[in-house]
Amino acid sequence: MEQLLVIKIGGNVIDNAAALQSFLEKFSTIKARKILVHGGGKIATKIGDQLGIQSNYINGRRVTDAATIDLVTMVYGGLVNKKIIATLQSLQCNAIGLTGADANLIPATQRPVVYPTSNNEAAAGSDLLGIDYGFVGDVDSASLGLQSLEILLSNNFTLVFAPLTHDGNGQMLNTNADTIASTLAVGLSKKYAVRLIYCFEKKGVLENVEDPNSVISLITKEKYHQLIAENKLFDGILPKIDNAFDAIDNGVNEVLIGDANDLLQNITINTIGTLIK
């Protein structure tokens, strides 16, 4: 099977112009078919402040009210995405900027508010309990526009996705970029040998959060459960690893987690970052 790379970058790259330029220069040289999924970084908050749109968070998650969904659609789908596209085009990488609404590529449903009931034990244990995050989308993975994605990839386009989906009724939805990346990776794994790469601010998954060099080179499910039992993983990394194992269980060959530039410099070997397999 032909190789496909699905790479996700977050705020540590998006918010740093020099880091983003360096990343895109390396990314543009990758010969394999590739998809880039980017987060929004702090730019939406900065522009929101300038426009008088307050940013609200609950449990570290952005609340996407009516004003905010308009803001992030403009910033993520417009400013951030198109600056990435323009840079890649300048590097002779024929990229196309997309959201989940384009060609109905990534349909989603608005996340409902969950309230406790006497027979809803799952809800009672959830940190999302009784909280309305607004216009946030949960991806409908069964309805991905796979045929359109494959046509774009087969015509040598590099796909660059903003973290936005839609509900099919005209409403844009703010959606977790990690989830978009893993959903695309799984959906395309029947046609391609997919490697999913999560880039973030550390060199990999750390055994000791105080030691930036304590990178765990390989995490299997057995190792993962052991690390959780020993309380060695910080909360922020758990959703990434959960997404990684979900992707592997559903057809993705392997997942790498680590620093963006380190991973791209060593894209053909697995000695950098953390391999989830």
Question: Where do the protein language model's features map onto the residues?
Answer:
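C-terminal catalytic "cap/lid" subdomain
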Residues: 1-277
